Amino acid sequence: ISGSKNASLPILAATLLFDKPVVIKNLPRVRDINTMLNLLKSLGSKIILSRDKKTAKIINKKNMKTYASYALVKTMRGSILVLGPLISKYHKSKTSLPGGCLIGARPVNYHLTALKKLGMKFELKDGYILAKSKGKLTGTTINFPKISVGATENSIIAASLAKGKTVLKNCAIEPEIKDLTNFLNKAGAKIKWTGRVCKIEGVNSLNETEYSVMADRIEAGTFCVAATLAKGNLQIKNLNPNIIGTEIKLLKKVGAKIK
């Protein structure tokens, strides 16, 4: 099973927080991952890919750029995830809205509202978010009006280096988000979960680390369904079965034998 694209994108964005090298393993070979790696390169990161392109070593320069151009951002909604780490680490960012002027800020309004509560000031101009903060972001309590995966991820990443404690309420709790927090915690962040509440105690910096991205649960579930329909035998490797627990229960109900 391939690594999860939806877990890889926020983890790659979060590498912008690091002064020290980071190694991310089990990346899927899909276009959005290449786009995110190219976006990191454009910001100043040095990317060293393994021969199979599933492992990336990321080394950030001391003076990183903070401009995420429309040319790179337009093809991938997940590129808005660089806004949180850029404003948290470098206190400024010029990030294109996904889709530019045509779509506007509505798809990312929960991101902007949450980051504003952490201390980001911004204006929208010509399809770009022009953002800055006076020094470090400051921990606060944020209650998301609706559950948003991207806004939860951006807020967690940004709050990891903020001053003091941040409490995020009504968070999305998909396994990919838990994978992001596992990665950050492995690097020294202080993030705890209680249901849909995420508590983050800001730290000054993150440590050099290696991390393997979780398996793609959509791909795993698809293979399981296909094997059940075909009445065939299938062995799945590189998978924590807990991430497709619901699918396994349903397949067992229709007669699949899974162990």
Q: What are these regions, as identified by a protein language model?
A:
Residues 1-259:
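Short, structured segments at the rim of ligand-binding sites
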